[in-house]
Amino acid sequence: MAVVAVFQGASFARDDYEEAVRRLTGGKSRMESPSDWPVEGLLVHVAGEGAQGFRVLDVWESEEAFNRFGETLLPILQEIGVDVSPDLYPAYAFVSA
């Protein structure tokens, strides 16, 4: 079952996101393709800034796929000083073009 992961918090800003992307991709400034992720299973990735701060929303094909990604991502977030845990929940519906 697909899962949704939302990252948002007071200690998470656009600069932090950009640094995490650089570390995940070996120096790229943007995530542009599912092949940029270190594990398979990503269905959708959206990042942007709103009234309540910077937010990242991912949809993964399964919780197991997200957990594999977390094994790489969470140490990076700790290294750059981001203390945010994702809000993770099952996708009730998923539609893509």
Q: Each PLM stretch: what is its role?
A:
Residues 1-57, 61-72, 82-97:
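Short S/T/G/P-rich N-terminal loop/turn motif that feeds into the first structured element of a domain
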Residues 75:
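Short, aromatic/basic amphipathic alpha-helical patches
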